[in-house]
Structures are given as C-alpha cells and as structure tokens.
Curated annotation (Swiss-Prot):
Domain SSB: 1-100
Ranges where the record places region Disordered: 129-150
CC per GO annotation: nucleoid
UniProt signal peptide: none
Species, as recorded: Clostridium perfringens (strain 13 / Type A)
Record's protein name: Single-stranded DNA-binding protein
Amino acid sequence: MNKVVLIGRLTKDPELRFAAGSGTAVARFTLAVNRQFKKDEADFISCIAFGKTGETIAQYITKGRQLAVSGNIRTGSYEAQDGTRRYTTDVVVESFDFIDSGNGGARGNSGFGSGNDFGGSFGMPDNSFSDSSFNSNDDMTPIDDGDIPF
C-alpha cells in the first residue's frame, strides 16, 4: 500500500499551472515537515495536487500556513537540459485539511475543497474506543523477567 499523511508548513506560495490540452489545474508546493524527535530539523517534501484540489490549495493556502495532506508517493525521472537523468519524488495529494487559519493558529475552514475527505477531524482523537472496551478481568498470565528475550 502506498499511502502518506503529512502535516507541515508551506515553504512558499503554491505554483498553479494548467496542463496543456486538458486544462487540468496542477498545483506544486513544498511542505516543511518537522522530524519527530528533532524539532529543529525538517524534511522538505515536494507535493503536487491536481484538479479542484490543486485550485483550492493554490487559492487559500500561502507561505507559512500549516496544511495536512494525504496522498501517495510517486517517483519519476526526466532528462535535464544538460542531458543528465534527473529523478523526482513527489507526494500526489488526494485530500487535505487546513490546520490553521493564518491568524494565530485558529483552525481553518476545511469545507473549501472537493477532494477534502478529512472532514475537519484530522488530528482529533478517535473516541470510538472506550475504557469499557477492555475487560479488566481478562486472564493475565504473569511473565518472569528472565523469560523476556531482551
């Protein structure tokens, strides 16, 4: 399965173009995604969004704004003008959610884009499990520390 979920900030405003022939909107942008254990380090992930999703991102998201995207990783290659083979890796955005509104971190309206299937609940805890889902009377067999292989 090829599925990716990222939360990051745009490094610059999205670049919106339209494909020749079909006229399909194509938005390209880069997300700066903080690393989990080293908050002072980030990875810069190239993203591409097509159609209405791309148009919406280009219209409402600007440099520095926080965005959640879900999609898949796509690799490719092309021949550069100097004749060398260049390789690319992009996240193709399938859906997205605005994380902040650009005014102090308030949550943005996620209803702008079609293709946005996070439904405004991205990052919110899933309350479908309760403490009662786990029976405290389960038969728990004690394990001796010497039986643990590490």
